[in-house]
Amino acid sequence: MVTYNEHLKNILTQILDSYHILRDIQDKPGDLDNIKKEMLKINGFLKVATNNIDEYKISHSDFKKLKSKFSHYLENYFFEKEIETMAPLYSKDTHRVKNMRFKIIEALEDKKMIEDMGDLMEKI
């Protein structure tokens, strides 16, 4: 049976994997679909961590702070509509694709959310 800590670690690993894929995208025409896919995966895992993981069952108190950062991200950053609007017009414009990718990365790094995820993973 998977413990809460292991479950949380698996979720954080998948978020960080998608984050690293976003960072490594080369901003070629057609990459907007890849950006959208990774962003949706991140959002889904953040929702799972926020809604389904009980911070009182995690042995490290750092998760409570991180969970509030997840909620902040989900409440304040919404890129799906922008990507849907942008895709038909600018999906081949590498500068706009790059800018969208940077905005998503910047949002993920807001309040040191990504950094804190890595720190918590090391402690679990």
Roles of regions detected by a PLM:
Residues 1-6, 63, 67, 71, ...:
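A contiguous, well-structured "functional interface" segment within a domain
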Residues 1-45:
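Short terminal alpha-helical segments
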Residues 2, 7, 16-19, 60-62, ...:
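Helix-centric, low-specificity signal for extended rod-like, repetitive segments
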Residues 15-23, 43-53, 77-87, 115-118:
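Extended amphipathic alpha-helical scaffold segments
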Residues 21-36, 54-60, 86-96:
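Charged, low-complexity interaction regions
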Residues 45-70:
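Short, solvent-exposed, charged loop/turn and helix-capping segments
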Residues 72-124:
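Amphipathic alpha-helical binding modules
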